[in-house]
Curated annotation (Swiss-Prot):
PANTHER family: THIAMINE BIOSYNTHETIC BIFUNCTIONAL ENZYME, THIAMINE-PHOSPHATE PYROPHOSPHORYLASE
Family according to the record: Belongs to the thiamine-phosphate synthase family.
EC number per UniProt: 2.5.1.3
Stated name of the protein: Thiamine-phosphate synthase
Recorded GO MF terms: magnesium ion binding; thiamine-phosphate diphosphorylase activity
Cofactor(s) recorded in Swiss-Prot or TrEMBL: Mg(2+)
Length: 210
């Protein structure tokens, strides 16, 4: 699967205050609108709750034949036999995650410094940001200049993340990205299908999709 990875519209999904039914409906509508990959990110759930929710999201992703990744938790990814995992700089090292998960799984890594490109062995794609201020990353922004430098020097695909909406996509034009990752632009939208569809249109208009 990793050789055919479509990162164009990457959804980082968190259940939040939604009911499980509403959450799953939102994801399904987002997939129908053009989401190409889903990462389940649940910082507040315990391992059992995360696993149970993961089973349902995984089933949905399988039915639409899109990759399903787990945020941070290599153990949950292994238990689910998920398509892969996305790791932060403070999580298990990517090379160790690769040993545990095997060669066919997808591993993504958060990165925001050029020097971190030296340590991406075993990684399939990079997530870089935040591009815009978000509730959790108000003071941790990545400049567009640095994002562009990372994209130009990275041997693997780069996804921009952090406060990205359809307006922000125009600012990313000309940067050698493989896609964008969104959270609120879809998860908080009144209509996830239309939100995803419009984002996808803007992505194709503005990004080269390396």
């Amino acid at each position: 699967m990793k050789n055919k990875l479509d990162l164009s519209l990457y959804l980082v999904a968190t259940k939040g205050n939604k009911s499980e039914e509403c959450f799953l409906n939102t994801l399904e509508n987002a997939i129908k609108g053009g989401v190409s990959i889903i990462q389940l990110r649940e910082k507040e759930l315990n391992a059992r709750e995360f696993y149970k929710l993961g089973l349902k999201v995984q089933k949905l992703c399988k039915s639409y034949k899109i990759p399903f990744l787990i945020n941070d938790r290599v153990d949950i990814a292994l238990a689910l036999d998920a398509d892969g995992v996305h790791l932060g700089q403070e999580d298990l090292e990517a090379k160790l995650a690769r040993k545990l998960l095997g060669d066919e799984k997808i591993i993504g890594l958060s990165l925001k410094k050029l020097e971190q490109l030296e340590f991406i062995q075993g990684v399939n794609y990079l997530g870089c940001g935040a591009i815009k201020a978000t509730p959790t990353k108000e003071s941790s922004l990545l400049s567009l200049e640095l994002l562009s430098q990372i994209c130009d020097k990275s041997p693997i695909g780069v996804v921009a993340i952090g406060g990205i909406d359809k307006e922000a996509l125009v600012e990313l034009k000309g940067i050698n990205l493989s896609g964008v990752a969104v959270v609120r632009a879809i998860m908080d939208a009144k209509d996830a299908f239309l939100a995803a569809k419009e984002l996808k249109r803007k992505i194709y208009e503005n990004l080269s999709l390396k």
